[in-house]
């Protein structure tokens, strides 16, 4: 099964200048809870934006070049693997759009803000295809870093 997980702002933005436009503790805890022990798939840019491997998760990166620092996988490889177990698609924008037609579940957190000059966006979700089973809108707390 393919499952997407992402946080977006009120305008569907997920990135700015190659990084998340916020540090939102509630969403990071939610992401960890859902993906811990699982397999996460991401594009090269998302991989390079991480501080390193996230603990207790298998990391697979889609890229056109060989890498020594992480295991890589093809589009077809992701689809084949998703027949055997749940795969979490964690970004970025191109990867979300690529796998949206094959996605069975989406975990979306809406960050209560509007990011100026965002350059990466989550895919538009057709609510005739996807049923919302859980929806989170999180507001800024004292531990969070972003403009609201």
Language model segments and positions:
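Enzymes that bind and transform nitrogen-containing heteroaromatic metabolites
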Residues: 1-148
């Amino acid at each position: 099964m393919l499952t997407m997980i992402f946080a977006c702002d009120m305008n569907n933005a997920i990135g700015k200048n190659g990084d998340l436009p916020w540090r939102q503790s509630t969403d990071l805890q939610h992401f960890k809870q859902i993906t811990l022990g699982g397999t996460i798939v991401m594009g090269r840019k998302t991989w390079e934006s991480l501080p390193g491997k996230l603990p207790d998760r298998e990391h697979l990166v889609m890229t056109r070049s060989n890498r020594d620092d992480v295991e890589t996988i093809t589009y077809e490889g992701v689809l084949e693997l998703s027949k055997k177990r749940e795969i979490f698609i964690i970004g970025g924008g191109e990867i979300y759009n690529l796998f949206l037609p094959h996605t069975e579940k989406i975990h979306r957190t809406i960050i209560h803000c509007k990011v100026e000059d965002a350059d990466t966006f989550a895919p538009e979700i057709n609510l005739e295809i996807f049923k919302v089973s859980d929806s989170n809108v999180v507001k800024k707390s004292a531990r969070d870093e972003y403009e609201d």
